[in-house]
Amino acid sequence: MRGILYGVGVGPGDPELMTLKAVRLIKENDIIAVPGAEVRETVAYKIAVQAVPELADKELLPIYMPMTHDKAELELNHEKGAKALEAALDTGKNVVFLTLGDPTIYSTFSYVQKRVEADGYETRLVSGITSFCATAARLNIPLTEWNQPLHVQPAVHRLDSELDQPGTYVLMKSGKKMNQVKEILAKSGRNIRMVENCGMPDEHIYNSVEEIPDDAGYYSCLLYTSPSPRD
């Protein structure tokens, strides 16, 4: 009998924000897959091992996920990752794949999940706290009130033409484009706040667009808000 592949969110950075279910699945299963070549150096592993010290003694399966826009290279590595997971599942053991935040939000897990499912294997998703929910909590502010919409998107090329709707915008994957993002947001007149490395030891909070450094890291989450509908 084949094992089940679990995509488990470990939250944004603070190990105390990991769910009870995530902790239980890591404890109960022997094979833990982690996106990255050097598993013990990955952010997901470092978060999870603080909550589940037993993780250090588990069988760790590295799944290489390169940070590139080369579609051919991505496809090749996603396929290799899926095959490595399938080989582990064929032993009859479950595999727990650790992913930052929640596995349904810009997660590397989704790329291998589709391939593994297409080959007839069972997969299950286990929710984790998202980086943007943790960011709002860290800033002690609501993401939405009353009938305000919430927009979640990466910082893309046409950002200036996409931020004209009411509500709150969550801008993710802004690190490499931070200078451009700041220029656009500075013209908006809205409230801009950001948390870099939320919940991690090197966390930084920025309360205005002027405070945000151009070289902010990859794990930076911006909140771009309009005034409260009750104001």
Task: Describe each PLM feature range.
Residues 66-67, 102, 175-176, 196-202:
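Glycine-rich beta-alpha junction loops
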